Every structure is written in structure tokens, then in C-alpha cells.
């Protein structure tokens, strides 16, 4: 919570609120649902976006599984206390940020799809290796390697959506993202 609050400070201090549209909440909700239904209906016209959203659903589910069970696995398999699991998670976030920054030039040079493919493949290989190790320091080292690919997989996914979605529908498609 403290982490979130700290990094939200610039949002609260320097981002102005939008003016009230005057539209009643009930009308806004109805219009929003109508737009969502329309976006889903027309998604089939944009096959590349549809295929990407389906593929992303699968590999993001894998990432979410890592995030959800990684701490439990670390605690049970290596006897990590909650403070060490927290430090491991923070270190993973730092390496993910470094990986995202480091791979940004490859996203520009190769495009997002090869970066996503490389990242997801590396995450799978490193993740399997992490399940097999018995030494805590090796687990930590592999975890930091894993983090280097977690950031690019997520950043390149956003880049991919931004590139393949038609400009006029980009915000709607990011709503499905």
C-alpha cells in the first residue's frame, strides 16, 4: 500500500480532474456498456487484434499464476519468511523495470512480437529451472533473471496493442486489453 501511495503522489499533485460532463451516471453506464458491446461485436473485423488478445490472455494467465503462487512456492520450498518474500518481490519488480527499459530498444528495432516471444520463452525456461533448484541463492539468482524478462513481456505487449490497433479504436481495444 505504501508503495502504491508513494508513486501515486504525482498523479494527485499534478493531474487535473476532468470537467464534469453533466451526464447522469445511469446514462454514462448505459452508454459505456453499449460501447463495450459494440467493440466486442466489431472485434472480428480486426483479426490481428483479436488473435493478439487471445494469445495475450494465455500468456498473461501464466504470468498471473507466477505472481500468485511464486511467494507461496518460495515460502514453502525455501522457508522464506514474509519479509524475505516481500524483498524477493521488490527485487523482482526492480529487475522487471530494468528489463523493460533494456529491451525497449529491441522493441523499437525488432518490433514487439519477437520481444514478447523471447520474453515468454525465457520466462518459461527460467520458471521451470526455478522449480528444480534446491539452493535458495540459486533460486534468488534465477528469480532476478526471470524479472529481467517479466518487464519486457508486459511492456512489449502494450507496445504491440498500440501498434496493431487502429488509431480511432485504440482506447476501446485497450479497454479489452
Task: Locate the predicted segments by residue.
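Juxtamembrane intracellular "pre-TM" segments in multi-pass secondary transporters
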Residues: 17-54
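Structural signature of the two symmetry-related core transmembrane helices
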Residues: 114-129
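Helix-loop junctions at membrane interfaces in 12-TM secondary transporters
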Residues: 131-143
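C-terminal membrane-cytosol helix-exit motif in multi-pass small-molecule transporters
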Residues: 3-21
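Helix-to-loop junctions at the C-terminal end of transmembrane segments
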Residues: 98-112
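Intracellular juxtamembrane helix-capping segments at the cytosolic ends
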Residues: 152-166
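Loop-to-transmembrane helix entry/capping segments in MFS-fold secondary transporters
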Residues: 82-83, 167-177
Amino acid at each position: 500500500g505504501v508503495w502504491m501511495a508513494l508513486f501515486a503522489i504525482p498523479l494527485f499533485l499534478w493531474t487535473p480532474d476532468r470537467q464534469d460532463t453533466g451526464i447522469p451516471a445511469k446514462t454514462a453506464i448505459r452508454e459505456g456498456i453499449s460501447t463495450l458491446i459494440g467493440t466486442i461485436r466489431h472485434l472480428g473485423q480486426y483479426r490481428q487484434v483479436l488473435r493478439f488478445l487471445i494469445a495475450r490472455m494465455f500468456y498473461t494467465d501464466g504470468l498471473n499464476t507466477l505472481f500468485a503462487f511464486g511467494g507461496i512456492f518460495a515460502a514453502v520450498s525455501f522457508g522464506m519468511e514474509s519479509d524475505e518474500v516481500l524483498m524477493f518481490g521488490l527485487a523482482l519488480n526492480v529487475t522487471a523495470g530494468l528489463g523493460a527499459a533494456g529491451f525497449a530498444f529491441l522493441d523499437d528495432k525488432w518490433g514487439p512480437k519477437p520481444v514478447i516471444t523471447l520474453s515468454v520463452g525465457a520466462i518459461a525456461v527460467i520458471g521451470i529451472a526455478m522449480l528444480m533448484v534446491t539452493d535458495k541463492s540459486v533460486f534468488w539468482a534465477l528469480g532476478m533473471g526471470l524479472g529481467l524478462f517479466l518487464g519486457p513481456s508486459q511492456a512489449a505487449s502494450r507496445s504491440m496493442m498500440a501498434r496493431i490497433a487502429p488509431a480511432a479504436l485504440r482506447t476501446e481495444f485497450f479497454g479489452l486489453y
